[in-house]
Amino acid sequence: MLKDLVREKLLTIMNTKAYTQFNPEQLLQLENEMKIYMKSGDSALTEGNYFFLMEMLFYVLVYRNQDVDAQVVYNTFRDRLGENSYKMVIMKATLLQINGNDKGAIEYLENLLNDDLEYETDFVTYVSIAKKLIAIKTTSKNLSQESVLKEVVALTDKFPLDAELWWYASEIYFEMGQFEKACYCLEQVLCITPFNYACFGRLSETLYYEALRSKKQTKTELLEKALKNALRSVELSELYLKGWALVNIISRELGRNKQNDLIKLSASKLNEISAKSNNKDKITAELILNKI
């Protein structure tokens, strides 16, 4: 029974990629928990899920700068699966990257993509490798923001159903202050993932910033649209901190007073979040409440 619970917990963390948001202490705890579980001999763990968890362990070790241990995990994968799967390619590029060889990682991935990989492999393989290449170029400052955007947009033309590409493009447009284009990209994300509450929240936030620099009539229209998206985000996730904060802030920007139902409801929900949620959300909710 205990093994079942641990297995499901670890698989959930992997499926949701929650570990990518963990702090160093949480990563260490996860690493230790995974190593203990993997040695426990769970007969219900399928081979597919075993490699699934080993993949997570690899990236946890990378995040913790345990490059030697990460190499050991990679070698285990390579010995069992070979080097040709896209996950192995991305792992190898990651190892090159953490060992300070960004140039080598970039050349390795570019060579793969240029050797007719676009036409000889499946969609998942090509786009996964292409996204990894862009990520390395971005972190290594190998490309300007405009050049990164150009590559991402080119990929959205080839792979219009990849939500992650549209999200990434929206983030770049947002940083550049091109809010209208950022909104368009987020709307594409929602066409692909219509129940993505975080995307509704981000769209609301982007519309809000666009409204702040617009003329009065357009400003009101944009704020109303931003509020609608914020409300949709909390409809999908009842205790979504960012969503309720946006509901409160946008309602106030629209000139509604403290007795307005939405302002009272959002304040009540922020109080609930500050009492129930994790420490990070509690602190953030309390800061927002102090300002309103």
Question: For the regions a protein language model found, what residue spans apply to each?
Answer:
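Long, ordered, amphipathic alpha-helical scaffolds
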Residues: K219-I292
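Structural register within alpha-helical repeat arrays
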Residues: M56-L57, K92, L133, A169, ...
